[in-house]
Swiss-Prot record:
Its cofactor is [2Fe-2S] cluster; [4Fe-4S] cluster; Mo-bis(molybdopterin guanine dinucleotide). Residues 138-167, 181-211 form the 4Fe-4S ferredoxin-type domain. [4Fe-4S] cluster 4 binds at C264, C267, C271, C299. The keyword GTP-binding does not apply. Residues 79-119 form the 4Fe-4S His(Cys)3-ligated-type domain. It comes from the Bacteria. This is Putative formate dehydrogenase SSP0601. It is an enzyme of class 1 (oxidoreductase). Gene3D superfamilies: 2.40.40.20, 3.10.20.740, 3.30.70.20, 3.40.50.740, ADC-like domains (2.20.25.90), Dimethylsulfoxide Reductase, domain 2 (3.40.228.10). Residues 947-964 have a biased composition (Polar residues). Residues 3-79 form the 2Fe-2S ferredoxin-type domain. [2Fe-2S] cluster binds at C37, C48, C51, C63.
Amino acid sequence: MQEHLIVSLDGKDYLVEPGTNLLQFIKSQDTFVPSICYNESLGPIQTCDTCTVEIDGKMERACSTTIDRPMIVNTQNDKVQASQKEALDRILEKHMLYCTVCDYNNGDCEIHNTMDQWGLEHQTYEYKEKPYEKDYGPFYRYDPNQCILCGRCVEVCQDVQVNETLTIDWERQQPRVIWDNDTSINDSSCVGCGQCATVCPCNAMLEVNMEGNAGYMTDLEPGSLAAMIDLTKKAEPGYGPLFAVSDSEAAMREERIEKTKTVCTYCGVGCSFDVWTKNREVLKVQPQHESPANKISSCVKGKFGWDYVDSDERLTKPLVRKNGQFEEVEWEEALSVVAENFNKVKGTHGSDGLAFISSSKATNEESYLMQKLARQVIGTNNVDNCSRYCQAPATKGLFRTVGHGGDSGSIEDLEIADMVVLIGTNTAEAHPVIASRIKRGHKLYNNTLNVFDIRKHEMAERADNFYQPKPGTDLVWLSAVTKYIIDEDLHDKAFINEWVNHFDEYYKSLAPYTMEFAEETTGISKDALIDFAHQVADAKSVSIAWAMGVTQQDIGSDTSTAISNLLLATGNYRKPGSGAYPLRGHNNVQGCSDMGSMPDQFPGYQKVTDDEIRAKFEREYGETLPKQVGKDNHQMMEGIHNGEIDSLYLYGEDTGIVDSNINFVQAALEKVGFLVVQDEFFTFTATYADVVLPASPSLEKTGTFTNTERRIQRLFQALEPKGDSKPDWQIIQAVAKAMGYDWNYTHPSQIMDEIARLTPLYSGVNYDRLEGYNSLQWPVAEDGTDEPILYLEGFNFEDKKANFYPLTFDNFFKVNEEYDLHVNNGRLLEHFHEGNMTYKVPGLEYKVPNAFVEVSPELAEDRGIHEGAEIKLISETGEVELVAHVTDRVKGKEIYIPLNNNAMAHGDHGAINLLTNSDVDKDTDTPSYKRTSCRMEVKTRRGKSPLNPTNFRVNKQRQPQYSVRVQDKWKREDYTFPGSQVDR
């Protein structure tokens, strides 16, 4: 194959790699060619025809041309200019230029910029208004009269987000973008990701927060705005002066609209984007092509879920309980109360009488300081974080087998994998951008998708194969498949011989896991499992992703271990598109654990029981540190009940709602002698507090998050803290100072420098290396070299070999006659966990106003209930009252309750954890949230559906297709390729 080809561009020769896109090459040479429909994140769409150039004497679109031979390319001759002028005129026939009073006059309008740069002064064709009104959804709106039919929105919806809602109806006399089978935005299958607005080159698709808000004259009434547009156009003899005026107005906007790079504060994907703010209002969230985890992708929460930041419900002053009532106080008094009571408890109960719960919503720097406060200032290892509730078992399984507690590759590996296996993860709703990558690989590249889950969610519906095992039995089918692969000599012997220990011992341990035992135990047929085993063995690369459906079981650690065993047996580590992907639930649950907010580990998973490691931290901290392992979250609650713990300091976590068996937890919160809650809002847990400290959300601070793929990214402060609230790092430092320890940090970068000194995983991390959209995936060497794919140089053990880990199974879960229903639970796309943030976003609350319970059609028939029935669910630990949604997403006696209910603080009774019990994973103390059974009492047999009828889950009809179907445009009688027109 040739290394380079000669391309003559406007008379100058260049050496170009074969396969290079011609338009990108032209742009790389600083040669201007208009390209309004082209977006580097989307690739060629071929709808606008503006990028036409002459190639070897023939007029062709540059965007869809691959350099596969020597070429002579001309971008400047008369024919090219005439063709481009014709294409630009056709665009202005569809789009009225009124830039100065346009909401999108922000310097990014590609129509404005293209016309200006091309030098177009007058349009040939008069603008034609279309017979369509604007269409508004809760988050964005569509203006057909400004739409140029470039198709970017369709491309991103169909082939990037892969929600498959948008199409262009090319059959109409005047084509337009349509939703589903031609319904409104609000009544469609649209999930509100907003990517259509992200990629729109003009003001046709626009965030509703931008409309009337962005410019100096954009808030005019429609009639006045129309008059202003007419006046402006009549006053200017050509577009040049008009553009000059609008450019001046755009520059004025830049003075009052701040654009700040940040990282999303919701799930663990780690989407980064620019957030546009005016005063304290978030106008727009704009992902960038260089965003490392998400590119241009977003979900409804990341794109539109920011209203909570300026909510009137934000805490803005410290609160201290006095005579049973909370009173606002100044920081000095609040900190004095905290220090006095910490010292008091330490004096009466010792250092281990205090406990600390860190937040997976906070930054790495803040999580680091929380464990430092516990260990250096107080002298206890009683510190933990919410990874205990979800991800600790996955980390345990990976530490056992491969040595690092994190994803073995990157998100992009899930897109390029030959096969993706999803186990116990509702990825489309819990990790939407990752789901989009998987859906894209499945749709465009024909990658195989296998889903194992007890619930038929979207990914299950899309899968090539969907398997529904009995609850809690994943370890069995995983081990049976691994055994079958080895029995049939399908395992990767060369990989095992070179890279894995303990094969013989492990193979012997698989003896009980016959296909017959697996079929009987899991309910999946032997034939289906054998077929799956062959698929795994034959695939070039396999990636397995899992989440809380696996980890929140009595044997979550063992099942996670079984996943890694299967990957090792088939050689699916150490190469692109392969490996283990425990999908982290929170924006920084990975980082919070990395930072040592755990009872047994310092930052970087360095054990507190290791004398050498502990001595290193003692030298840094100047104190003797405890060597005994502390209490985890679960043990803290027990410690309060039995009198061992009398003070608890937690931040960024609503423990009284999110922990399992919350009747038990709430009793502990009531009993503990001194409780400090640090949060953005007065949470349910705060009702038990003695002191409440007002904290700042991510937009009001600087720091770093580490996402599910071990990617460390900086977030930059976009807003000043509201009222007297403070970033968590400042509050924790102030608590330490009140206790007599002056840390003297003036910026989070200093904290990261300290982390890097002490933590080999982060040794090369500093803020300079994370400037802008730069990121690093740990482990990071001192020179800044990171590892997007783990284990290329060997596994994280002394001998560089992984370990097979034998497992046993005797954990049969069965409901009994009294509690005959199995309760599953998890996230909804629109809300994040209990909803403390998302219920303060009107559009999200509108789409899903309350939690509910999914009931199967067969169970509904058996109990004589219908949509909207009010039912009471009763378990051994508590009861809830919910409204039923009847759906085939669940089957039989499986029911599903979303997590999104924080309403107990308002007197409601829908929180899932009133039903869950205190059972835990035997190795990590992670609550067995998924191992819950209950019985049902019917209060009313039918009623109003708990879902808004506009919700995408309610009988919506997606319209899958590939790209924008531009060929249908080309077939229209009124279409002629401009290049052909000038060739005549």
